[in-house]
Amino acid sequence: MSSGLRAADFPRWKRHISEQLRRRDRLQRQAFEEIILQYNKLLEKSDLHSVLAQKLQAEKHDVPNRHEISPGHDGTWNDSQLQEMAQLRIKHQEELTELHKKRGELAQLVIDLNNQMQRKDREMQMNEAKIAECLQTISDLETECLDLRTKLCDLERANQTLKDEYDALQITFTALEGKLRKTTEENQELVTRWMAEKAQEANRLNAENEKDSRRRQARLQKELAEAAKEPLPVEQDDDIEVIVDETSDHTEETSPVRAISRAATKRLSQPAGGLLDSITNIFGRRSVSSFPVPQDNVDTHPGSGKEVRVPTTALCVFDAHDGEVNAVQFSPGSRLLATGGMDRRVKLWEVFGEKCEFKGSLSGSNAGITSIEFDSAGSYLLAASNDFASRIWTVDDSRLRHTLTGHSGKVLSAKFLLDNARIVSGSHDRTLKHWDLRSKVCIKTVFAGSSCNDIVCTEQCVMSGHFDKKIRFWDIRSESIVREMELLGKITALDLNPERTELLSCSRDDLLKVIDLRTNAIKQTFSAPGFKCGSDWTRVVFSPDGSYVAAGSAEGSLYTWSVLTGKVEKVLSKQHSSSINAVAWSPSGLHVVSVDKGCKAVLWAQY
């Protein structure tokens, strides 16, 4: 019972080794047991033969002695005795030879057995070494198995922990998903409310503008009525002249028509302190809608018949905005100037003589203005802004008409197409969007692959300047890239000459280039020792006749180059104390306006 317990206490591998040793002992003992028994018998026979040989040798010596001691009766050996002794000697000799032969065989057998024993000993040593190695391997494997069991336990615990965490995260995810759904619904509701409030705000602004317009009209009517009541000095010569012009073949009798003509002549003859001053003051307080653009001032043929003058003198320096001014643009009639700044407003200014008089502001943007453009008639103003949207106002009543949203980044440029019914906008989100103002929707979105800093348009092509140093040419009809041109720096601005055959570009490598659109070749490169592009949206401009280009530098100087020679015509400084962001040249060719990162705008002309 105790042996059974001890055997049960042994590990299985020990019992396995013990059984293998017993099996090997049985196999080896069966193989050599017969040999060992035969060997023992041979040893016994050898000992027996040795004893017999010694006995025979003793008898051999004893027989002659006996014969010598006891010879025949006559004291001589007879023949029979001699013959017997000879036969006995031969027999003994043969037995001895046979014994020696067997002894040699046994000796050889002993040697062979010794060799076999040595081989077996070596095999046993090798087996013992293998057994020791196997035991060591078993020990290592047991240790490794123990480590693996420990790791398995750790992994099972970690797996259980992960399962618990996963279950907790799943519960959390389900809760967060519900919150997200609820938040999305709330966000949608807030967006809807926000859009409604924006619409109400736009309506409120439009109503306020309408009220202001009505108040101005009422004030104008009142002052006109008061001015009409004032006594007006009459010059007799004028009355006589009017009468002669109006009634050369009539009598001198006064008629109602003649009375009206005299009244009109009297009003025209009023001195500066009378009716005209009152009307001028009234119009000076009105918005820009009081100045409709004269049709003869609208530039139907750009660049034709313009008297372009290179600016030399600062006529007017004024604070245009509360902060940085990013954009400036003249109306087609050259009388109205628009500026856009980081104060989220577009301001309108009237340019007359040497002054710029503030006429009103266009509100509705939620972030800084980045780009401004008038339509070809000067009736609408388009502005891009940092709130991911573009907006359109009517100039005559300062009302917000359209808000174009859809970009996911700040809109850096927006331009009218030539039909004034479509718009192209470029954004920091690396897309260009094509808008239809009639349907008020985005017709197409094109992924450009890089942030768009500026846009210009021709009849069939849109050209965009990008952050990746490339100018891309897009076909309006297919809205695909026709070609690309890579410059040495990031593109900050683009402009077209009046004939729309040359493209002006400005880049961050401080170079301006004129590109011939007919040959796709760089026609002229402009640079100057002190000129440095101040930002990624520094705007440059052609003169109305395409003979000059103007750009502002980072140190606040205004540079003018000749397109024909490529040389600097004029450098104007000392007015701006910060980097110039944008430059505009009036369609009449008489004025240039520059705006900077401070709040200043400078009106330049040649004097």
Swiss-Prot record:
One of its GO terms (biological process) is protein localization to phagophore assembly site. PANTHER family: AUTOPHAGY PROTEIN 16-LIKE, AUTOPHAGY-RELATED PROTEIN 16-1. WD repeats lie at residues 320-359, 364-403, 406-445, 447-484, 486-525, 532-573, 575-607. Homodimer. Homooligomer. Heterooligomer with ATG16L2. Interacts with WIPI1. Interacts with WIPI2. Interacts with RB1CC1; the interaction is required for ULK1 complex-dependent autophagy. Interacts with ATG5. Part of the minor complex composed of 4 sets of ATG12-ATG5 and ATG16L1 (400 kDa); this complex interacts with ATG3 leading to disruption of ATG7 interaction and promotion of ATG8-like proteins lipidation. Part of the major complex composed of 8 sets of ATG12-ATG5 and ATG16L1 (800 kDa). A motif (Caspase cleavage) lies at residues 296-299. Plays an essential role in both canonical and non-canonical autophagy: interacts with ATG12-ATG5 to mediate the lipidation to ATG8 family proteins (MAP1LC3A, MAP1LC3B, MAP1LC3C, GABARAPL1, GABARAPL2 and GABARAP). Acts as a molecular hub, coordinating autophagy pathways via distinct domains that support either canonical or non-canonical signaling. During canonical autophagy, interacts with ATG12-ATG5 to mediate the conjugation of phosphatidylethanolamine (PE) to ATG8 proteins, to produce a membrane-bound activated form of ATG8. It is found in: Cytoplasm; Preautophagosomal structure membrane; Endosome membrane; Lysosome membrane. The WD repeats are required for non-canonical autophagy but not for canonical autophagy. The WD repeats are required for the recruitment of LRRK2 to stressed lysosomes. It is a peripheral membrane protein. The keyword Membrane applies. Residues 79-230 form a coiled coil. GO terms for molecular function: protein-membrane adaptor activity. It comes from the Eukaryota. InterPro entries: ATG16, Autophagy-rel_prot_16_dom, G-protein_beta_WD-40_rep, WD40/YVTN_repeat-like_dom_sf, WD40_repeat_CS, WD40_repeat_dom_sf, WD40_rpt. The keyword ATP-binding does not apply. Residues 207-230 are annotated as: WIPI2-binding. This is Autophagy-related protein 16-1. Keywords: Autophagy, Coiled coil, Cytoplasm, Endosome, Lysosome, Membrane, Phosphoprotein, Protein transport, Repeat, Transport, WD repeat. PROSITE patterns: WD_REPEATS_1 (PS00678), WD_REPEATS_2 (PS50082), WD_REPEATS_REGION (PS50294). It comes from Pongo abelii.
